[in-house]
Amino acid sequence: NKGVDGFRCDMAEMVPQAFWAWVIPQVKAKYPNILFIAEVYNPNLYREYLAAGFDYLYDKVGMYDYLRGVTSKNWSAEGITLQWQNVDDIRDHMLYFLENHDEQRIASGFFCGRGMCAEPAMIVAATLGKNPVMIYAGQELGEKGMDAEGFSGMDGKTTIFDYWGIKSLQAWANHGKFDGAGLDDEQRKLQTFY
């Protein structure tokens, strides 16, 4: 009744599956359209967490890690096939992403250096199946996450521990006009791509 339409459950595998198998049906009985997304990094447990009621699981140690390797480490794209085949029976329940609060920004010096270099990986993530794709705030603008902000320091991520401005989103917001006038040409091109 608060308008929440989903829960992203951080490190869900650290909580016993029995709990999720009990709580998720309780919530869905009252709010049948609510989504539960789990962060589970052990592929051997994926099917168990889906059976416990989760709608989607982060595909971090499969598709994310591999797409990052192709994008920034010159891995062969041929291995992408194995990544989706490993979860083919549950692929519609795997959430693809290229950035999140735990991972370094694509445009950071720790990953790729430019947001545009991940366009091929984003096309793969968005078109390989019917499963959802997450775009992290600022990813569509090439946010670098290269500030030495607060607790986390300069690590190529946008801090989640401190009150901090996301430069690309501030440029897009343009002092409350929300017209993107503060974006540079590369940011505009990337936003058009997304």
What are these model-derived regions, one by one?
Residues 20, 24-25, 84, 122-125:
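Short amphipathic alpha-helical segments and helix-helix/interface helices
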Residues 79, 88-100, 105-194:
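Loop/helix patches that line or flank the sugar-binding groove of alpha-linked glycan CAZymes
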Residues 25, 49-61, 148-161:
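Aromatic- and acidic-residue-enriched segments that line the glycan-binding/catalytic groove
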Residues 5-14, 61-73, 103-114, 175-178:
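The substrate-binding groove and active-site-proximal loops of carbohydrate-active enzymes
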Residues 50-54, 72-77, 112:
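Short, surface-exposed amphipathic charged segments that create phosphate/polyanion-binding patches used
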